[in-house]
Regions:
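N-terminal type II signal-anchor transmembrane helix
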Residues: 2-49
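Short alpha-helical segments used as structural interaction elements across diverse proteins
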Residues: 5-9, 13, 75, 158, ...
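A structural signal for short, hydrophobic/glycine-enriched beta-strand patches
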Residues: 34-191
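A general structural signal for short secondary-structure boundary/capping elements
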Residues: 101-106, 174-177, 196-204, 219-222
């Protein structure tokens, strides 16, 4: 039997299928982002004076310098926010959680030194060297560092994801929003990445994802 499908019809069919896939993916991204953002409502704070006291603050890690070797403003603002909370008496201890998968790359130690330079005593800072992802940092805060409640410290969009994870892992979390970075080109890039990260975290929670490492319990402030 002769195939009557023309190249034009095939292209049209392919475009329809691609269009449906794009719409479906956009819907998934939208639903997941609304779900995460909704979960964080009422738990985000901008002003030090308004945020309730929590014994422990969890500082989420990032690289101190960007790909060009320049200071990373996301990092700088997070350190400043964490120090503000400590000096205002809003937290008594800080867990600095980040990536240390290579000896020469140590986010927690960099954060510790930055906080000490901002006047935070070394004795109140605890390092989580296996905070490879936000998911790992939040779960380890409860399972390894023994916390039932915590103040998360990062930028607003990052905090939303962290609070969502906490709420689904039995950790009562509020968040203090560090200043964001006002660079339009970077804003678009980081927000696009964050939208996709929120989809991933919804799937991680739904499918019972576990951190890469747990380990022995660490007592904070004892």
């Amino acid at each position: 039997m002769k195939n009557t499908t023309t190249p034009k019809k095939r292209r049209k069919t392919i475009l329809w299928i691609l269009g449906i896939c794009i719409v479906a993916m956009a819907m998934v991204v939208g639903v997941c982002n609304r779900k995460v953002n909704k979960c964080a409502e009422g738990r985000m704070y901008q002003n030090v004076s308004e945020i309730p006291y929590r014994r422990v603050g969890l500082v989420l890690g990032t690289t101190p310098k960007n790909a060009k070797g320049n200071p990373n403003l996301y990092y700088r603002y997070r350190m400043k926010a964490a120090a503000q909370l400590y000096h205002a008496g809003k937290v008594s201890y800080l867990i600095v959680s980040g990536d240390n998968h290579k000896r020469e790359y140590n986010e927690p130690e960099c954060m510790r030194q930055s906080l000490i330079a901002l006047g935070v005593p070394d004795s109140v800072i605890y390092s989580d060297f296996a905070g490879f992802r936000t998911f790992d940092s939040m779960v380890r805060c409860k399972e390894v560092f023994g916390q039932d409640s915590v103040t998360v410290i990062s930028q607003r969009w990052h905090n939303q994801r962290a609070v969502y994870i906490a709420q689904h892992k039995g950790l009562d979390a509020i968040a203090y929003n560090a200043n964001d970075v006002d660079m339009k080109w970077w804003y678009v890039k980081s927000r696009t990445r964050e939208m996709l990260a929120k989809v991933k975290v919804v799937l991680d929670v739904a499918f019972g994802k576990q951190p890469k490492f747990l380990g022995e319990p660490v007592a904070v402030g004892r």
